[in-house]
Swiss-Prot record:
This is Protein GrpE. It comes from Bordetella pertussis (strain Tohama I / ATCC BAA-589 / NCTC 13251). InterPro entries: GrpE, GrpE_coiled_coil, GrpE_head. GO terms for molecular function: adenyl-nucleotide exchange factor activity; protein homodimerization activity; protein-folding chaperone binding; unfolded protein binding. The keyword Ribosomal protein does not apply. PANTHER family: GRPE PROTEIN, GRPE PROTEIN HOMOLOG, MITOCHONDRIAL. The lineage of its organism: Bacteria, Pseudomonadati, Pseudomonadota, Betaproteobacteria, Burkholderiales. Its main location: cytoplasm. The gene is grpE. GO terms for biological process: protein folding.
């Protein structure tokens, strides 16, 4: 902080202070201009702060809507799959409600039910993994239960023990297989 200055005597002693009223006018004009600049800068800062708050609120709204969309997709995805399975359950219940059916009638009913279930799987992107003998072992789709010496190259599927399933491109359950350990 600067030391207080002594008041300037406003009585003209000589010609030096004769320009003081013009200097005061210049300083007053400069002060007014600086005040106007300050007010403009403060208004700009306030506007930018409001913009930041609006942007933050918009980002929060986008995040919330995205969460709601994910929740709805999950809910309705499950709903679609459930709707596909209802006819399968209906067929099984109808088969059980029939008294004294012959073995052939039961077999035909089970085949129809299996077709309905397969169609439900296909509609919901659920696909079977059923590697054939001689296929190359894929650790992303298969799970080797055992490895046995064989005439096949190593890591070749020898036997399918249980089918696997993928849903959309994600393995739901790997196929259980026996693989070749190579020639032993």
């Amino acid at each position: 902080m600067t030391a207080p200055q002594e008041p300037v005597d406003s009585t003209p002693e000589s010609g030096e202070n004769a320009a003081t009223p013009g200097l005061e006018d210049d300083l007053s004009a400069e002060l007014a201009a600086l005040r106007a600049e300050l007010e403009a800068a403060q208004a700009t800062v306030k506007a930018q702060q409001e913009q930041v708050l609006r942007a933050a609120a918009e980002a929060e709204n986008v995040r919330r809507r995205a969460q709601e969309d994910v929740a709805k997709a999950r809910k309705f995805g499950i709903e679609s799959f459930a709707e596909s399975l209802v006819p399968v359950k209906d067929s099984l219940e109808a088969a059980l409600a029939q008294p004294d059916q012959a073995a052939q009638a039961w077999r035909e009913g089970v085949e129809v039910t299996l077709k309905q279930l397969t169609a439900a799987f296909e509609r919901n992107l659920l696909k079977e993994i059923a590697p054939a003998q001689g296929d190359k072992f894929d650790p992303h789709l298969h799970q080797a239960i055992s490895s046995v010496p064989a005439d096949q190259p190593a890591n070749t599927v020898l036997q399918l023990l249980q089918k696997g399933y993928v849903i959309a491109d994600r393995t739901l359950r790997p196929a259980l297989v026996v693989v070749s350990a190579g020639q032993g």
